[in-house]
């Protein structure tokens, strides 16, 4: 790779330096700060004068405030031109400056009343609410002038706090008691003293007080009985006694209980004290010190449950004589009183209540309303004291909910302290007005104006503000003023966030106006529309056409477009050459002089342009080319770049961009040129490879044909053979021999006179036993002449003596790139393209309906299939197989028939090639050639043309692939024969499915890419080697028995973790820290090594980004990754791009179902030895050996090569070859064919439940209509007994086998199980009791795949989660619980540790009694929750699980993505930890912090010998991980913009600009690639890049 260093000298300027800073902070602005930004107050709602069209003074577009509308000219015209720069006009007050200041200058509005900022008030969690401990609903009542808030404690004359406590909100109904108490003239005087003493404070009463209060009730009743009076009068008498003793009587309420207590004034105990002490048992006494007065309180309690009725009666007396207290013990009336007892609650007062209270209390009740009240309360908060209090409360509290609330509050308080801001600034007193050019007013034709919505919203605010000032001066009624204040609050709300209001402000046509929040958030918001993606100058757009004559580094640009794009360069050159003025040069351009075209040729010669095709899904969506001027108006594109751009020539458009600066041109040429983009960044395989016509041409050129002119000729040299072809003596495809390429003399000739028999020219063996083709064709010679050659003229990649299909061409290009480098590959590609097109034209290949050969055997095969199916239907009717088995077997039969017909059809077509040529006949079958060469169409499509259309997919319901996902009636016809009406109707299902998927899933794939980019954009290669000793172990990847990916494919391009040694030969294959090349990977396979340790980004210890050693080779270049490579974005694009491609690919096959056919037997193909592991077996009555273990493994060791093959043997399989047995393959002496030997077989469609003992069957909880359903199969008509889901928790269907010795064995029956035996049947060991259907008819389709990928990347809990074992051990099934759940115990025999798990009723168990399980292994069916793997096995295992699961989805589609891309995303998902013990750190328990920060702090605390914090890894989904990014600019530009900015502002967050998005947003070079010349990360998170150092110089 080329390393580029730029040294740029910048001109010094006196303006603000937008580069020389290293962080951005956002915080809440103070009113003074807003005023310092402002250039004047906006006082009027006017915009521009309707006659002069000039801005109005003091209006929203005022020139005096915001600057002049014309450059260097004041409003009145007194001062014009630049010479008056900086002068302020004495007439109009406008400064003479440039008009662009109208984009920068703010104004402000002085609000007549404070107004709450909607973000801090309503964006959950409400910051104002958190600080004041208030509910958002209560806050809104105050802010929107519905209720008053009490600003100070209300004291009575004795200094005791009254009901009204500071911060309480008071409302009407609740305070009638005040009304009655004060305004009722009868009781006003009489009970004045009592009223003065009413107190309501929370006092914890002892539980033993019931006795005393019970006696108070007895006292009242006793007095009534002895005196023969009513209880009302008795209560009145007690009150009079209290009055005489001048003792205050107090009452305290709670929702369900009432406590009476007596407050005795020490100065006058009086008579009542004596009565009480005689009659009552004293329960407790409390002393309160208040204003140097000691008050003793003695408590008497009334039993709460029994007192209601009596007290209701008594309450009338109390109400009558104590009008100020409404003692109504009614449940619906009491709850409001609860508020009075809590010191942190708020009681609302309505207007009427305030007046009544103030009549009685004068000014001692301080209340307020609106944002002003809230601002006052916020002003009183002392943040330091508040913080101490919160810490103290956190230590005391035991409630998790309370702790969470306190932590939220602490975060807010800490934020204000750190950012040195005040909470009251969240309430606005000064409103900034944004610059007028950011909310323009544009004149349209016909005297109309188009205006930004913000102007309307500002106008409403100014109007209401001015009106409020006016009515306040008029001394209007308070109701009117409050209403106007509310309207002002609503107007400001609408400006800040119109969308989140209940009734948004609308404009003309009921359109919701766009507020400031709307201009920031969403796709059309400031972040995503203007900061992350900008429109650029020097660009054009046109339709693309193919440019077959272009070289790979060229593109054709229309002359007219080039003239416009290169205008400044042409003008510069004209001025230089012709020595003319700028105006003359422009005139020459417009005229189109001949000189202009000559200059255009010159300036475009060495100036690359960038071509881009939308959607740009990966970095190959923008590539650089050298422009070639072409006639017409279309851009010409090199055909080999089509696959990278995903372009075709059916009307696609592309954009052209012109790099202006020398640096940009250099980067375009060195890094982005199409010749440098031959490999795909996703897989490292070539992407610029021949396709379609080019493949067809090369395939035709290199094919051979019997019976053509010149067959069997022998030539002395290549040139002689070509001359003969040109003289038409030899055909292009004739088999010939050429000296230097093939052997000349045939081994079968006896003498020189004999003629060679060309039909015997077959492949023969050379001396070293390798296979060679002992003939060639002129076409192959011509093809090989285009290949790169060595200096001595020999072929650099040896002679390619074979038919060149697409697969062969890709392999050739790949090999050329790896062995000969980029330059020779580029030349090779252009040559392949040239001859491909040439010979595709000469071949004149086209499609003919006669070439669609329908196999003659088709009818017979279909007939046989139908016979087999009718046999299966009969078996199903007899109940021998289940409905599910019937369906699966039918699908299997049709799948096999379709494949067989397709094979026969292809063989028929292939035979045409081997027939001798006769003039007037076709040489080859064009359709076969297209499909076989890979130029157009697939086997599947050709099968549908001439074979049989096959099975179709239904519109999908189950993602897993359930029964009925494939329509079981296939389309037997093909397109050549034509479909019947029914078949056509069935096929429309599939066709529509494809189209619907395309539309819906493209958006989903695009969104996935966006989330991936957001989570990984800051992962950049920042150092050479992080020095870690950790890594991951990878080997051959298997899915069941099938090898998915071999070890050599997986480890190429990685760094070895340790030395890798061939133990047999004691050779060092790979050194520690060395890159693994393809050759070294081959040596690994030869040495039989199945697993090695490699460095991985998952274990990389780089603080920011990753290191080059852990990343390894860059797939896009095939070389070690360079410093500054943006590997995170590369990873996101590599995963997201195929997602979109796959989505678009479903409909090309027209919905024909391609099905995964399940393996159901294991055959030995070569001699070898059989070994089993974890095997437990039993013999059935037929003498067959049945497998009883769930995780049995068969290892087949072939000899003499000692190659091991591993197969999973499922429960219920029948074994034919036993452990340790040797297998020898016999060869049929007549046919010479090997006969494979069957080792084991099983039913792939259902899992049996097998009896392990002889005994009698008993059904438990198997009840007809409850847990058992007799289903009549719709197709077979046979009755099946199926276990169904049941509502009763207590039933758990199971089969119990009673052994002859009386002991019993239980077998749980999951839902959908089909019973095979009947109750009370006698069974033998090995007999099948029941069958569980297996849903295996999955169709290969990304529809199920994309949601699965998203689910894994989001770390979501799957819908049906499997129960996972947390320890290694042996399984014991304890049996069903009361609710029908199955209890599974896992016991470790070594440690004796035991764990129990409950498997929900109806879930399938995947383990059986006595099975051995490993930790993290599933006990029940369902998807494994990645969070469980993390908890049980740790980060490494969850990483491996996620990478493999995601890869599985893509592999099913045949998409190749390098593991390291997925690893990078998974690394980001695990880049946070949760604190479990804060130790001596500043962290709080439960807090989520970045792993890097945590490790730094941990080391620092350990270094100081402190107690280090403890944390555990957590898995965050990509969306959560993006939003928890350290950078608020990055997070805000992703999602939830307003919430992120609110949070950032309150906590005064600092963005250190480490990632890519934040630097793009503020317009700096990104810290990646050439923008990362020198990175220095110090402990303070400071971050310096080259450009900043330049700026500082």
Swiss-Prot record:
Keywords: DNA-directed RNA polymerase, Magnesium, Metal-binding, Nucleotidyltransferase, Transcription, Transferase, Zinc. Pfam families: RNA_pol_Rpb1_1 (PF04997), RNA_pol_Rpb1_2 (PF00623), RNA_pol_Rpb1_3 (PF04983), RNA_pol_Rpb1_4 (PF05000), RNA_pol_Rpb1_5 (PF04998). It is an enzyme of class 2 (transferase). Coiled coil: none annotated. Signal peptide: none annotated. Mg(2+) binds at residues 648, 650, 652. One of its GO terms (molecular function) is magnesium ion binding. Zn(2+) 2 binds at residues 1026, 1100, 1107, 1110. It catalyses: RNA(n) + a ribonucleoside 5'-triphosphate = RNA(n+1) + diphosphate. Its cofactor is Mg(2+); Zn(2+). One of its GO terms (biological process) is DNA-templated transcription. Binds 1 Mg(2+) ion per subunit. Its EC number is 2.7.7.6. Gene3D superfamilies: 1.10.132.30, 1.10.150.390, 1.10.1790.20, 1.10.40.90, 2.40.40.20, 2.40.50.100, RNA polymerase II, clamp domain, RNA polymerase Rpb1, domain 3. GO terms for cellular component: DNA-directed RNA polymerase complex. DNA-dependent RNA polymerase catalyzes the transcription of DNA into RNA using the four ribonucleoside triphosphates as substrates. NCBIfam families: rpoC_TIGR (TIGR02386). HAMAP family: RNApol_bact_RpoC. The RNAP catalytic core consists of 2 alpha, 1 beta, 1 beta' and 1 omega subunit. When a sigma factor is associated with the core the holoenzyme is formed, which can initiate transcription. Belongs to the RNA polymerase beta' chain family. This is DNA-directed RNA polymerase subunit beta'. The lineage of its organism: Bacteria, Pseudomonadati, Elusimicrobiota, Endomicrobiia, Endomicrobiales.
């Amino acid at each position: 790779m080329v390393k580029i260093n730029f040294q740029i000298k910048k001109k010094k300027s006196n303006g603000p330096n937008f580069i020389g800073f290293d962080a951005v902070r956002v915080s809440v602005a103070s009113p003074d700060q807003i005023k310092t930004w402002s250039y004047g107050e906006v006082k009027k709602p006017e915009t521009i004068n309707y006659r002069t069209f000039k801005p109005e003074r003091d209006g929203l577009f005022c020139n005096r405030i915001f600057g002049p509308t014309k450059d260097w000219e004041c409003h009145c015209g007194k001062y014009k031109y630049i010479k008056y720069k900086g002068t302020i006009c004495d007439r109009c007050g406008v400064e003479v400056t440039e008009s662009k200041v109208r984009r920068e200058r703010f104004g402000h509005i002085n609000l007549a009343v404070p107004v709450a900022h909607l973000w801090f008030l309503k964006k959950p969690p409400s910051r104002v609410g958190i600080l004041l401990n208030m509910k958002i609903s209560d806050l809104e009542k105050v802010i929107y002038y519905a209720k008053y808030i009490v600003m100070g404690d209300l004291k009575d004359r004795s200094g005791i706090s009254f009901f009204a406590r500071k911060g309480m909100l008071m409302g009407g109904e609740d305070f009638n008691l005040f009304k009655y108490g004060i305004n009722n003239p009868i009781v006003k005087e009489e009970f004045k003293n009592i009223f003065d003493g009413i107190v309501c404070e929370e006092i914890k009463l002892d539980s033993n007080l019931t006795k005393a209060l019970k006696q108070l009730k007895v006292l009242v009743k006793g007095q009534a009985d002895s005196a023969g009076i009513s209880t009302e009068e008795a209560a009145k008498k007690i009150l009079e006694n209290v009055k005489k003793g001048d003792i205050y009587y107090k009452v305290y309420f709670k929702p369900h209980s009432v406590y009476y207590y007596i407050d005795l004034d020490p100065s006058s105990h009086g008579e009542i004290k004596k009565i009480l002490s005689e009659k009552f048992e004293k329960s407790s006494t409390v002393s309160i010190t208040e204003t140097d007065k000691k008050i003793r309180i003695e408590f008497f309690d009334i039993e709460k449950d029994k007192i209601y009725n009596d007290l209701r009666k008594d309450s009338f007396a109390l109400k009558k004589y104590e009008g100020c207290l409404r003692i109504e013990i009614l449940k619906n009336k009491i709850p409001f009183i609860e508020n009075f007892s809590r010191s942190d609650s708020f009681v609302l007062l309505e207007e009427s209540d305030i007046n009544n209270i103030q009549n009685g209390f004068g000014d001692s009740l301080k209340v307020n309303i609106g944002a002003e009240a809230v601002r006052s309360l916020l002003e009183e908060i002392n943040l330091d004291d508040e913080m101490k209090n919160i810490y103290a409360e956190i230590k005391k509290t035991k409630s998790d909910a309370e702790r969470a609330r306190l932590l939220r509050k602490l975060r807010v308080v800490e934020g204000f302290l750190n950012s040195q801001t005040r909470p009251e600034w969240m309430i606005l007193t000064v409103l900034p007005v944004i610059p007028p050019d950011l909310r323009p007013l544009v004149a349209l034709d016909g005297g109309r104006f188009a205006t930004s919505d913000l102007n309307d919203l500002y106008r409403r605010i100014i109007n209401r503000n001015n009106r409020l000032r006016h009515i306040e001066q008029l001394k209007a009624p308070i109701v009117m003023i409050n209403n106007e204040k509310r309207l002002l609050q609503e107007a400001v709300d609408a400006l800040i966030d119109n969308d989140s209001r209940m009734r948004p402000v609308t404009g003309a046509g009921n359109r919701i106006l766009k507020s400031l929040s709307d201009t920031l958030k969403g796709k059309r918001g400031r972040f995503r529309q203007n900061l992350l993606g900008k429109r650029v100058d020097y660009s054009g757009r046109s339709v693309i056409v193919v440019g077959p004559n272009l070289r790979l580094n060229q593109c054709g640009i229309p002359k007219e477009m080039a003239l416009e794009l290169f205008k400044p360069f042409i003008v510069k050159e004209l001025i230089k050459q012709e020595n003319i003025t700028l105006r003359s040069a422009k005139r020459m351009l417009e005229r189109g002089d001949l000189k202009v075209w000559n200059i255009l040729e010159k300036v475009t010669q060495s100036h690359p342009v960038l071509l881009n095709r939308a959607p740009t899904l990966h970095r190959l969506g923008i590539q650089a080319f050298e422009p070639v001027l072409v006639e017409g108006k279309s851009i010409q594109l090199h055909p080999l770049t089509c696959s990278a751009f995903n372009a075709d020539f059916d009307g696609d458009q592309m954009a052209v961009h012109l790099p202006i600066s020398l640096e940009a041109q250099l980067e375009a040429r060195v890094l982005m040129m199409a010749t440098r983009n031959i490999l795909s960044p996703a897989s490292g395989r070539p992407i610029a490879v021949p396709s379609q016509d080019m493949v067809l041409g090369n395939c035709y050129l290199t094919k051979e044909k019997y019976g053509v002119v010149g067959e069997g000729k022998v030539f002395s040299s290549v040139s002689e053979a070509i001359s003969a072809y040109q003289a038409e003596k030899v055909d292009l495809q004739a088999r010939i021999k050429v000296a230097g390429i093939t052997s000349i003399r045939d081994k079968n000739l006896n003498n020189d006179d004999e003629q060679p028999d060309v039909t015997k020219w077959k492949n023969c063996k050379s001396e070293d036993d390798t296979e060679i083709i002992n003939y060639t064709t002129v076409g192959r010679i011509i093809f090989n002449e285009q290949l790169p050659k060595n200096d001595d003229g020999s072929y650099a990649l040896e002679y390619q003596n074979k038919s060149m299909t697409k697969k062969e061409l890709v392999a050739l290009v790949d090999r050329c790139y790896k062995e000969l480098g980029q330059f020779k590959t580029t030349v090779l590609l252009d040559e392949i393209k040239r001859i491909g097109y040439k010979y595709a034209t000469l071949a004149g290949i086209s499609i003919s309906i006669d070439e669609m050969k329908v196999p003659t055997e088709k009818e017979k095969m279909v007939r046989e299939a139908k016979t087999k199916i009718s046999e299966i239907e009969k078996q199903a009717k007899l109940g021998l197989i289940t409905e599910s088995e019937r369906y699966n077997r039918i699908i299997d039969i049709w799948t096999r028939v379709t494949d067989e017909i397709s094979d026969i059809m292809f063989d028929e077509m292939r035979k045409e090639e081997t027939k001798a040529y006769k003039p007037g006949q076709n040489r080859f079958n064009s359709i076969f050639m297209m499909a076989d060469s890979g130029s157009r169409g697939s086997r599947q499509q050709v099968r549908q043309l001439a074979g049989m259309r096959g099975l179709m997919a239904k519109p999908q319901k189950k993602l897993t692939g359930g029964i009925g996902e494939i329509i079981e009636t296939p389309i037997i016809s093909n397109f050549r024969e034509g479909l019947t009406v029914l078949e056509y109707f069935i096929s429309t299902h599939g066709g529509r499915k494809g189209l619907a998927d395309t539309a819906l899933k493209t958006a989903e794939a695009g969104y996935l890419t966006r989330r991936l980019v957001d989570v990984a954009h800051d992962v950049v290669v920042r150092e050479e080697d992080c020095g870690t000793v950790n890594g991951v172990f990878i080997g051959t990847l298997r899915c069941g028995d099938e090898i998915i990916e071999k070890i050599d494919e997986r480890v190429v391009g990685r760094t070895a973790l340790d030395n890798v040694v061939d133990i047999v030969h004691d050779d060092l294959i790979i050194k520690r820290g060395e890159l693994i090349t393809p050759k070294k990977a081959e040596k690994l396979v030869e040495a039989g090594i199945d697993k090695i340790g490699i460095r991985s980004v998952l274990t990389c210890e780089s603080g920011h980004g990753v290191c080059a050693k852990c990343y390894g080779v860059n797939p896009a270049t095939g070389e070690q990754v360079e410093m500054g490579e943006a590997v995170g974005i590369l990873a996101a694009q590599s995963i997201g791009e195929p997602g979109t491609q796959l989505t678009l690919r479903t409909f090309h096959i027209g919905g024909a179902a391609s099905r995964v056919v399940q393996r159901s037997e294991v055959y030995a193909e070569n001699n070898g030895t059989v070994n089993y592991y974890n095997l437990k077996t039993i013999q059935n009555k037929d003498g067959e050996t049945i497998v009883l273990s769930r995780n049995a493994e068969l290892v087949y060791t072939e000899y003499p090569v000692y190659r091991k093959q591993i197969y999973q043997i499922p429960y219920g399989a029948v074994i034919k070859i036993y452990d340790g047995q040797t297998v020898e393959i016999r060869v049929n002496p007549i046919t010479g064919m090997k006969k494979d030997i069957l080792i084991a077989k099983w039913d792939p469609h259902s899992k049996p439940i097998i009896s392990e003992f002889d005994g009698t069957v008993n059904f438990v909880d198997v009840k007809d209509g409850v847990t058992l359903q007799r289903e009549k199969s719709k197709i077979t008509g046979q009755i099946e007994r199926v276990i169904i889901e049941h509502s009763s928790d207590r039933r758990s269907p199971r089969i119990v086998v009673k052994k002859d010795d009386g002991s019993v064995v239980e077998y749980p029956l999951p839902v959908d199980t089909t019973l095979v035996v009947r109750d009370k049947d006698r069974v033998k060991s090995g007999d099948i009791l029941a069958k569980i259907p297996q849903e295996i008819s999955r169709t290969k389709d990304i529809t199920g795949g994309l949601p699965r990928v998203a689910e894994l990347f989001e770390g979501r809990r799957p819908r049906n989660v499997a129960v996972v074992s947390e320890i290694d051990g042996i399984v014991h099934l304890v049996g069903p619980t009361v609710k029908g759940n199955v209890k599974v115990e896992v016991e470790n025999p070594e440690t004796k540790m035991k764990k129990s798990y409950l498997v929900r009723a109806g879930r399938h168990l995947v383990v059986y009694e006595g099975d051995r399980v490993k930790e993290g292994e599933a006990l029940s069916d369902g998807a494994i929750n990645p969070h469980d793997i993390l908890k049980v096995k740790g980060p490494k295992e969850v990483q491996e699980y996620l990478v493999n699961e995601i890869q599985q989805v893509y592999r099913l589609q045949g998409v190749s993505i390098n593991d390291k891309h997925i690893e990078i995303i998974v690394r980001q998902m695990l880049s946070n930890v949760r604190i479990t013990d804060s130790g001596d750190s500043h962290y709080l328990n439960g807090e989520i912090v970045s792993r890097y920060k945590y490790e730094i702090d941990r080391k620092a605390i350990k270094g100081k010998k402190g107690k280090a914090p403890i944390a555990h890894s957590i898995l965050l989904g990509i969306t959560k991980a993006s939003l928890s990014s350290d950078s608020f600019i990055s997070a805000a530009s992703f999602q939830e913009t307003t919430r992120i900015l609110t949070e950032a502002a309150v906590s005064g967050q600092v963005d250190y600009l480490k990632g890519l998005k934040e630097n793009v947003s503020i317009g700096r070079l990104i810290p990646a690639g050439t923008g990362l010349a020198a990175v220095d990360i110090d402990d303070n998170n400071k971050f310096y890049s080259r450009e900043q150092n330049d700026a500082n110089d």
